[in-house]
Amino acid sequence: MEKLTFLSLLLHFVVFIASTIPSSSFLLNDRTFERSNLPSTRAEKLIRELNLFPQQDLNVIDVADLPLTAAEGPGIVERKFVFPNILADGGPTVDDLGHHAGYYKLPKSRGASMFYFFFESRNKKDAPVVIWLTGGPGCSSELAVFYENGPFKITSNMSLAWNEYGWDQVSNLLYVDQPVGTGFSYTTDKSDIRHDETGVSNDLYDFLQAFFAEHPKLAKNDFYITGESYAGHYIPAFASRVHKGNKANEGVHINLKGFAIGNGLTDPALQYPAYPDYALEMGLITQKEHDRLEKIVPLCELSIKLCGTDGTTSCLASYLVCNSLFSGVMSHAGGVNYYDIRKKCVGSLCYDFSNMEKFLNLQSVRKSLGVGDIDFVSCSTSVYQAMLVDWMRNLEVGIPTLLEDGISLLVYAGEYDLICNWLGNSRWVNAMEWSGKTNFGAAKEVPFIVDGKEAGLLKTYEQLSFLKVRDAGHMVPMDQPKAALKMLKRWMENSLIEDATVTVAAQGGEELVAQM
């Protein structure tokens, strides 16, 4: 039972924060709001501007408007597709590639279907299967398809050009629109919307079972889970669900070898207090501003403790309190892009993804994909709201078991991202309790080399690796596509350090030798 007395204290604290930190004018579209309705109003306003959230509803459609590829019963309906205007400057022809799109009707739902893309590897059919999950919660994985690591990039004239550094170069690549209501995924009943990682991970596990039943040859391949941002919640829960299914001999055995989290939110208790420290280090705030924000940290930490792993109302209160740290930084940072502090935030998303939305709403594209009349939006506010109580929960708790059972974890983070910064990610990775904690903590950072140049700083011990990526923000595959592809390839080959022995000049003229 949640401690409502302390919850009341937390909500009064949010009122105090709103009146003392000028950041409320940054995070709120309206500069004034009714404090009597603080929790719902504040939460709704925060939703709209904190993390890639246009103000559209989730895809709840009428049965008469079901997509052409909708499954009649639980299972997958998949088709090969060809995008219009895809070949720009040579490269492989569409006939050489296996591009698939489909819907999976969720068995544990009233009328929900998840949309997915599947791109066969350009080179080796026995390459690992990699699934990518975009965060949000409620943001479509098509963001990654067209702007990060998919087979092609969308150009200014709405045509597609081949992506030289698409992850389908080294893997069979899956992108799923999830949770239900995200992107082209839809439901005919609002009761299907998910509110926690249990529902999300069960849906993804059911999808994988159906996908490998549809593609039995791929079930023999190694399998990796990847993603970024709020996928720092999805990925550990999903990996644990797959591992649990394997141990219980449920359905098709999935050869889970590892999972990778890019600029994720995984352990809020260690990541939120990093906001003032990161902002000070990067020159976004002064020491005085840092010290003022530090006074909020203890109550943020206490509110997260109240939230625990299964709280509800207390987790919403924790979200409101702890985001005062983020909003406090932003009130002094001005119009900085919190996904890449080297840039200014332009538009409601800080990035311009409008060409993708226009492209995916073209009738020719819709016909190719078989998605019917579903309106595509990059991110769903309603999905975000539904998952809000999940935000402050700690998803690190299930990771040690996976590491102990030999499943690899790579955490990577672009150095210029504020919202899921490398410092907070480094802290939870180093603090995690597992048998290799001491040795990982003692491991030296070594350069991550791409084409003879340092592309990041790498720390690794046995199954656990942490990579700070140079010259990148929140979306590493977008900012550093070549380094991101090299990272994925080497990680799957268990060779993140390129050579058997790397010698680099360390501070003070000493030499640091990194052994694989």
UniProtKB/Swiss-Prot annotation:
PROSITE patterns: CARBOXYPEPT_SER_HIS, CARBOXYPEPT_SER_SER. Keywords: Carboxypeptidase, Disulfide bond, Glycoprotein, Hydrolase, Protease, Secreted, Signal, Zymogen. The keyword Flavoprotein does not apply. The keyword Secreted applies. Belongs to the peptidase S10 family. Its EC number is 3.4.16.-. The gene is SCPL49. Residues 1-22 form the signal peptide. Expressed in roots, senescent leaves and flowers. Its main location: secreted. SUPFAM superfamilies: alpha/beta-Hydrolases (SSF53474). It comes from Arabidopsis thaliana (Mouse-ear cress). Probable carboxypeptidase. GO terms for cellular component: extracellular region; plant-type vacuole; vacuole. The lineage of its organism: Eukaryota, Viridiplantae, Streptophyta, Embryophyta, Tracheophyta. Substrate binds at C420. This is Serine carboxypeptidase-like 49. GO terms for molecular function: serine-type carboxypeptidase activity. InterPro entries: AB_hydrolase_fold, Peptidase_S10, Ser_caboxypep_his_AS, Ser_caboxypep_ser_AS.
